UniProtKB/Swiss-Prot annotation:
It comes from the Eukaryota. Expressed by the skin glands. This is Brevinin-1E. Its main location: secreted. Disulfide bonds join C65-C71. Keywords: Amphibian defense peptide, Antibiotic, Antimicrobial, Cleavage on pair of basic residues, Cytolysis, Disulfide bond, Hemolysis, Secreted, Signal. Residues 23-45 form a propeptide. Belongs to the frog skin active peptide (FSAP) family. Brevinin subfamily. It comes from Pelophylax lessonae (Pool frog). InterPro entries: Antimicrobial_frog_1, Frog_antimicrobial_propeptide.
Length: 71
């Protein structure tokens, strides 16, 4: 029973350390994002362009069909 408690305590301790390291890294990443607004603009462009390409792929054939009347 004592070894089980010791093992559980060790796992809890290691998990707590791991969690605190992850939080520190996440905080550092958030500070970098606040310091560099250009990166956030690039992320927005990356999200926007695939959406725009998908919409164009759906609507361009329909528009072309209506213009040329060759459906």
């Amino acid at each position: 029973m004592f070894t089980l408690k010791k093992s559980m305590l060790l796992l809890f301790f290691l998990g707590t350390i791991n969690l605190s390291l992850c939080e520190e890294e996440r905080d550092a990443d958030e500070e970098e994002r606040r310091d560099n607004p250009d990166e956030s603009e690039v992320e927005v462009e990356k999200r926007f362009l695939p959406l725009l390409a998908g919409l164009a792929a759906n609507f361009l054939p329909k528009i072309f069909c209506k213009i040329t009347r060759k459906c």
